[in-house]
Regions:
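Serine-hydrolase catalytic machinery in alpha/beta-hydrolase-like enzymes
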Residues: 5-103
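Conserved alpha/beta-hydrolase "nucleophile elbow" surrounding the catalytic nucleophile
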Residues: 27-29, 111-113, 165
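Active-site signature of alpha/beta-hydrolase-fold catalytic machinery across serine-
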Residues: 38, 122-126
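Alpha/beta-hydrolase-fold catalytic nucleophile elbow
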Residues: 53, 111, 137-138, 195
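Alpha/beta-hydrolase fold nucleophile elbow
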Residues: 102-112
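Gly/Ala-rich beta-loop-alpha elbow adjacent to hydrolase catalytic centers
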Residues: 112-116, 120
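A conserved short beta-strand
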Residues: 129-141
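The feature captures the conserved acid-bearing segment of alpha/beta-hydrolase catalytic domains
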Residues: 139-217
Length: 217
């Protein structure tokens, strides 16, 4: 574990001596930086892989990018301010990585699961000039977290891979199916897949997004 970045992180450095492409991993609610980092051993060695720990601790363990609150009737809402604070810290990490690990500022990808997926999508739509590829697993577009849309030209270089479990019991698949529609309305290139699983990443899902990323880094 290393902590040169604003958030606790684990890092796998690239085999390249300079200008390495970057993949930033954002875990889901209640997890930590080591969860998605398990993918690192199977991903291209030229990638500098940075797995970040969300800033808000949960009891008895785990971390969150923002609180999810419930009222007496079990209605649910997100803490938008915490989400925006987390996105600002993630952006600081992305900017710091360039000098720390000699990475390529024009080749930064995000991979997020669940809550991490929701923020990955929002970060790319709010800061399209910063990112190249987005892998969004088991999440959706939360419009509360988005800035006003930019001109379509701002998004023309972005590529999105999104996937969801057709039996997801945490985030309804119907929410995820709205993601490609929104991306297409902005002229953004995207791929969407569903797999016969719940709230998780099937092996077939992993191999599909791995190849998708290899073709684009």
């Amino acid at each position: 574990m290393s902590e040169p970045l604003p958030l606790v992180s684990v890092v796998r450095k690239s085999i390249l001596s300079s200008k390495a492409p970057v993949l930033v991993l954002l875990h889901g609610y209640g997890s930590n930086e080591n969860d998605l980092f398990s993918f690192a051993a199977e991903l291209p060695k030229e990638l500098c892989i940075i797995a970040l720990r969300a800033p808000y601790g949960l009891e008895p363990y785990g971390h969150a990018w923002y609180a999810i609150n419930f009222d007496a009737n079990q209605n649910k809402w997100n803490d938008v301010e915490q989400a925006k604070e987390s996105m600002a810290i993630i952006m600081n990490c992305v900017n710091s990585a360039q000098s720390l690990y000699d990475t390529d500022p024009s080749n930064i990808s995000l991979l997020g699961f669940s809550q991490g997926c929701i923020l990955s999508i929002a970060l790319a739509l709010n800061h399209p000039e910063k990112f190249k590829n987005i892998i969004g697993l088991s999440g959706y577009i939360c419009k509360e977290f988005l800035n006003d849309p930019q001109d379509e030209k701002a998004y023309k270089h972005l590529n999105f891979y999104c996937s969801h479990g057709s039996s997801d019991q945490v985030i309804p698949v119907e929410w995820a199916r709205e993601t490609p529609k929104h991306l297409e309305s902005l002229g953004i290139k995207n791929h969407y897949s569903e797999f016969p699983v719940g709230h998780g990443v099937a092996a077939e899902n992993f191999f599909e997004f791995k190849q998708w990323l290899i073709d684009r880094i």
